[in-house]
Amino acid sequence: NEIFEKAFKIHLKGKIKEAQKIYLKLVKKTEKNHNLFFLLATTYLQSEDYDKAINFFNKSIDIKSNFADAYNNRGIALYKLKMYQESIEDFNRAIKLKENYFDAHLNKGISLRNLRKYYEAIQSYQNCIKLKSHDAKIYNNLANVFVELGNYDKALKSFNKAIQLNKNYAEAYFGRGKLFSLNKHPKLAIKDFENTIKIKDDFDFLYGHLIHTKMRICDWSNYESLIKKIVNGVKINKKMIDPFCLLSLIDDPKKHRITSELSFNKQTELPSSIKNFSQLNKIKIGYFSGDLCDHAILHLTLDIFKHHDKSKFDVYAFYSGLKEDKWT
């Protein structure tokens, strides 16, 4: 009807809240329109209210069980809630209903990467290439997977392809810059970070990567303006720089603390208390690190492991990194 069409046009103009109010009034009058519930759910998805989005996508799917777009969008909401396996199940449902559903294949790859199922993610992106070979997002996402697998040559080729397809692709410049920095090509990294800033300068830690890379080669050009930019960002709680890097740049404990708090990613809830524990003859000590390989951290801690009193302690080391060498 006319009211629905009006709401849809408002929605297309990006007036999310205004469209949402009209959709809410309309759903009270009808409970049979799957598109109406889908669009209402989408406004909540765009507003980052993911629980409500899922609730209304559910209602849309209840009305039309073969609605591929609803499964895909519900999968996005689940992904945003870090329910990666559940999101993959929805993307699979969407793909089953619409085999050549590009967005669902792409979204599935992103969720698989977050579960560290890298080879399955690569397969999803390869399916995307078959459907839309000139989409730069695919190659950028592929590059990020190859970086995590340590396959830097393939990562570089994929970043290059993404940038070739989209000269203004800030994410690809930033990713390639980090790769160049990792591979000890600081001048190329600096160029990519600066290109990123020209296009889009609000990536987390972008300015920190730039100034740290410049410091490595004693490039002090624009040093004061970069410091000012970083400090001003930290003041408004933006993720500007790694806390350890900031320590070497300014003497300001308050900003050091803010940077540390912003960098800390709370993965799990802390246990309230340990009520029951077994009585053991030895105390078990576990060391967790992603650097227990041929890395300075391991070599600096080897003596700690060696000098524990084995009659009193059982010592365990848990390696969470990807690199494999003779030390892992």
Language-model features and meaning:
Residues 1-328:
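Alpha-helical solenoid repeat scaffolds of the TPR/TPR-like class and their adjacent stem/linker regions
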